[in-house]
Amino acid sequence: MTRRLTNKLLGASALVLAMAGGAAWAQDVVAPAVGAPVVAAALDTRSTGEASSGVIVLDADARRHRLVSAAGLAGLEVLDLTGARLGQVPAGEAGGLDVRYGFPIKGRPETLLVSTDKTDNALRFFAMRDGAPVEVGARSVPLGFAVEDVCMLRNASDGGLYAVAVGDGGEIEQLLLYADAEGRVDARSARRINLPSKIKYCVADDATGQLYASQQAVGVWRFNGDPEADAAPALVDAAGLGRISEESGSLALYDGGQGARYLIATDASSGRLFVYDRGAGDAYLGAASLTGRDGAAIKEPGALQAVGAPLAGLPSGALVVTDEDAAAGPDYKLVSIAALTGALNLSAGTPQDVRAVVAPRFPTVVAVAETAPVGSPGDAADDPAIWADPTHPANSLVIGTDKKAGLNLYDMQGRVLQHLPDGKMNNVDLREGFILGGQPVVLVTASDRTNKAVAIYRLDTEARRLINVADGVQPTGQGDPYGQCMYRSARSGKTYVFINDSNGEKRQWELVDAGNGKVRVVRVRDFAFSSQVVRTLLRARG
């Protein structure tokens, strides 16, 4: 389900100054480096009409490696690695661009490109086929904000592939990518993170799950790329207070194996490249300046891509540098990774094959249905209870908690049938066969953190509605009612509810007919655990 996360970060200057008391900062405050070594490009491509970003797309046949350029209104341009232009594909106003390998389309692994279309502020998808991009998107995926860049991230846990779009207003939108039965690629939002000002670039590390974002006025951030993880950022380097002089620029990741995994970032104001050690918490390693083959300085490097694969004349791969201000017109420079690391007395290591798709750590089970997103931001969709219709399974119902707003009742297509804004409901459970007013009913209870109470409902399976049947507020007497479950004794037929406090204390109540069409609780016993119990499941044995 979609998770909407908003970091309440107040402003660029206040943000950096607050790091000691908030998000972690990976670097000490130091003056910018001086006297950085100069590294010349190994190749300058021929000038293109516009060069927003470029990626090298690898092929099994090295002669068919391609450089794909996001060329603004010219769409996507295709060049060989000598810089010769081979073709062009319409893609709207192409800006940001990224590539991943082994994406399944109709059961076949394909090389997938994602690009931003700045005309519509949307994402478009292409498969690399016979050396050229072929559009395979089910649609142009709208973002709803002014997009600046896009990067992709493969989740190592389940193998899911995500596109991460960043925007002019500080938006970070993470979308899960999938192909339908017809082979069309689509996306759905997984989470949104907001920073208070423009994010210009992003890059992601599939191996570690780290997402890096360049907030232009502030610096380089590192996030956990798992959409279910805490979105708390760590500041790798800061503009003004760190090594970045004024504005943070583009980002790239190089993987040379153990001891040679680097984050590369540009200082948009000075034109320097900064290199950080991803194996040591992104510790700073050194800085360099770049020139073209002719020695002309690359004053403001644009988008970057690092390719850790042997290329012709470049045994450790290349850093693709966008040079929008080249004298002869915008082009791309290929900088030898070996030359760059050598200038900084670093090891290039052993280039890792970016085309190798590592098997996910856990098996993947694909859902056959998904509910509409809950209305509250953050980790709000927490706990479901399912009523299974024994006669017509398609009419079964799902009750889910919105931990910040109440309960939702869904049908089996995921549509919201009812929303009850009754408080912060943490967990929910149900039992059939409770006798209320002489009739068996489906009884539903939830741990209500707003009123510190047991919330009690009857599920009307015909009307498909939840009806509050609590005999007034049923207080728990707990400081923070948290994990909850129900139990029906097979021996006595009595129905119970258990709720634990966040301090580990658990309390049990019997649910009884109050005689007025309502239900009340009668406290049965207390017992304690040494720490907080998030959720308890009970199996009826007597």
Language-model region placement:
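Gram-negative bacterial Sec-dependent N-terminal signal peptides
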Residues: T2-W25
